[in-house]
């Protein structure tokens, strides 16, 4: 089962550490090729695999918790609810809307009826799900990206662009990926979630390479920042500060952890211990490592 609701990424204690260690042990026993076969299998086969493999059972239970939340939660005025689904996939629900970003999940298409728009930072399969994207298009809901459709589609941008969807005001800019040769590949999304959240600002950088000169269309302060665990260690800190192309976040949620389709640490399957160690060195005192299925609530200037 997912971590209990009483747990919080912001409370780092022995009980949580023990739970994360158990999850890591489950993950270590699941090889990448087995996980990929789970992603690509027929529905019935994948559901059977979930019943016999502990980390897949956890993966599905976390999804069910998120689905229940976005379907049934009533968001108080002045607040926002945030879930980590998997890897860098987040869902944010406000009193007046709901969006998702970088959703890569076996059952992702089930989210489509409940989200108003979808953001995709870049064209790598651990950051999108084809079935969810198609379901969104079928429902005539916006999908924001730099590649899915040509620029005649109003939600495609190859560079800086601003959008407004309902009460959400969205700024984007485009940056290089960490991998050499992938220039202008990753879109950064900075989203003001509207006055009914107290103008909560959420920023997600995908697999950006953290080059400040490319962060050209961002506000200098955000409430919650989602960076990846950087292979080029601590370059996450490049974008933290008061200079040009930098932001000052109230909270950082370090992500891209336990990407099960990657073969191991050398292939960027970062462990939970590595994530916690890295989080301790990020230049934001409120830096945490959430786990799949966990919900956080922004209220009165704090994330709990």
Question: Residue ranges of each PLM-predicted region?
Answer:
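Metallo-beta-lactamase
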Residues: 1-84, 91-110, 117, 128-133, 144-199, 289-295, 299-303, ...
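Short amphipathic alpha-helical segments and helix-helix/interface helices
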Residues: 89, 130-137, 188, 214-216, ...
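Divalent metal-coordination and catalytic microenvironments
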Residues: 92, 122, 170, 207, ...
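Active-site-proximal loop/helix segments of hydrolase catalytic cores
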Residues: 105, 176-248, 258, 262, ...
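Short, charged, surface-exposed secondary-structure boundary motifs
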Residues: 110-114, 128, 152-157, 165-170, ...
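Histidine-centered divalent metal-coordination motifs
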Residues: 116-117, 121-127, 256
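Binuclear metal-ion centers of metallo-dependent hydrolases, dominated by the metallo-beta-lactamase
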Residues: 155-169, 183, 215-216, 245-304
């Amino acid at each position: 089962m997912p971590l209990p609701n009483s747990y919080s990424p912001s409370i780092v204690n022995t009980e949580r550490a023990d739970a994360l260690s158990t999850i890591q042990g489950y993950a270590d026993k699941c090889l990448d090729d087995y996980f990929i076969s789970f992603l690509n299998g027929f529905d019935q086969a994948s559901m059977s695999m979930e019943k016999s493999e502990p980390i897949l059972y956890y993966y599905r239970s976390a999804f069910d918790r998120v689905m229940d939340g976005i379907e049934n939660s009533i968001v108080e005025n002045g607040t926002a609810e945030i879930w980590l689904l998997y890897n860098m996939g987040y869902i944010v629900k406000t009193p007046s809307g709901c969006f998702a970003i970088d959703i890569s999940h076996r059952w992702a298409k089930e989210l489509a009826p409940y989200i108003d728009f979808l953001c995709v930072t870049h064209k790598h399969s651990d950051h999108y799900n084809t079935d969810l994207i198609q379901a969104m298009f079928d429902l005539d809901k916006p999908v924001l990206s730099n590649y899915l459709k040509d620029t005649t589609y109003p939600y495609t941008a190859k560079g800086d662009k601003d959008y407004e969807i309902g009460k959400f005001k969205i700024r984007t800019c485009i940056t290089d990926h960490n991998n050499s040769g992938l220039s202008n590949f990753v879109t950064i999304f900075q989203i003001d979630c509207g006055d009914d959240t107290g103008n909560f600002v959420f920023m997600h950088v995908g697999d950006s390479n953290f080059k400040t000169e490319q962060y050209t269309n961002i506000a200098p302060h955000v409430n919650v920042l989602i960076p990846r665990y950087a292979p080029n260690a601590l370059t996450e800190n490049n974008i933290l500060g008061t200079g040009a192309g930098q932001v000052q976040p109230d909270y950082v949620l370090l992500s891209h952890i336990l990407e099960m389709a990657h073969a191991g640490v050398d292939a960027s399957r970062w462990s939970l211990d590595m994530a916690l160690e890295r989080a301790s060195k990020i230049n934001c005192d409120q830096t945490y490592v959430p786990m799949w299925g966990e919900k956080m609530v922004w209220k009165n200037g704090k994330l709990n």
